[in-house]
Structure formats: C-alpha cells, structure tokens
A protein has these predicted regions:
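The feature marks the mature, well-folded catalytic cores of soluble enzymes
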Residues: 1-174
Length: 174
C-alpha cells in the first residue's frame, strides 16, 4: 500500500498537517486503486497529527459551524489534476469524498503523477469522460467558490476549500 506506507509517514506531510493548523481531518479514501488498507492510513495519520481523524461520512456533523470548518482538513481521493487551471477532480461515492472536499476550509489532495493532465480536454480524452458519464456527480475543485448572486456582492468561499494543497507523487520504478 504505497500511500499509507510511504507518503503518509513522511516528515513533509507531517509539516503540511502541522502548518494547516487543523483540529480534525476528514478522511474519505475508499479502499481501491491507491489504498488497499484504510486502517493503516488512518493509523499513520493519527501518528502525524494530534488532530482527530474522522471518516468523511461524519463531515456534516464535524463541520456544523464556520469555526469547525476552518479547523478541518479534508482528505478526499483526487482521481486527477488539471495543470492549466490548478484543478483537482474528486468523484462522488459512498465514502463521502464530496463532503470532504466541499465542507472543510483546507483540502489536501495526494495524487499519482500519472494522474496529472495538462488540460480538462486531455483528461476527458483519456478516460475522464467515462467517469463524468458514470457518476452522479464529480467535483472539479479549483479553490474557493465565488458568487455574486446576492445583491451583486462578491462572496468568496461559500463552498469548497479556501486552501488547496496538492502533493504529487512519482510512480515507483518498475
């Protein structure tokens, strides 16, 4: 299990978590492509941070106030990143990935370098289109939302993270 065994215990990730100043981490990684042992990832995170590590299914109770959302780091599984816009792609699912990407103020995405695409069109042409057609929702997270639909006053950060941290990992040599 590459992510739990090598990325999570790293001193760099410990510094990122400490710098984020979060009191809780919402973990939304399902077992699958990059994670065969969710319990190992949770244990490794608990060893790096004094923050509470919660399953993202508890996001709505963990982020009921603005103060709670500010103190929360979301760690959903990003399936791709788009270099031209700084966007990460998060798929929906029972693991709570969308809540973990929309409710906390800080979002940490850990990606395989092979999942980094120059543009949205490149990603869509190499399999992203099928994900968009198969899932009920897919979040394209570029940063805090911006809206001016109430009295034409710009409001930033109503939905989505205010801080987006992306860690890109090189594939292991064959």
């Amino acid at each position: 299990n590459r992510f739990a065994a090598t990325i999570v215990p790293s001193p760099a990730l410990a510094r990122l978590l400490a710098g984020a100043g979060c009191s809780q981490v919402l973990l939304a990684w399902p077992e699958g492509k990059h994670l065969q042992d969710r319990a190992s990832l949770e244990a490794a995170l608990r060893g790096l941070t004094p923050a509470k590590v919660l399953h993202a299914g508890r996001a709505r109770e963990a982020c009921t106030t603005l103060e709670q959302a500010e103190g929360t780091l979301g760690l959903p599984p990003a399936v791709a990143a788009l270099a031209d816009s700084g966007t990460i792609v998060v798929e929906s699912g029972a693991h709570g990935a969308l809540d973990a990407s929309l409710l906390p103020a800080t979002h940490l995405a850990i990606l395989d370098a092979r999942d980094l695409y120059p543009t949205f069109a490149d990603w869509a042409g190499r399999g992203g289109r099928s994900l968009l057609l198969e899932r009920s929702s897919v979040a394209l997270v570029t940063g805090p939302s911006r809206t001016a639909d109430i009295e034409m006053i710009l409001t930033i950060g109503v939905h989505g993270p205010r801080r987006l941290i992306v860690v890109v990992c090189e594939p292991e040599p064959a």
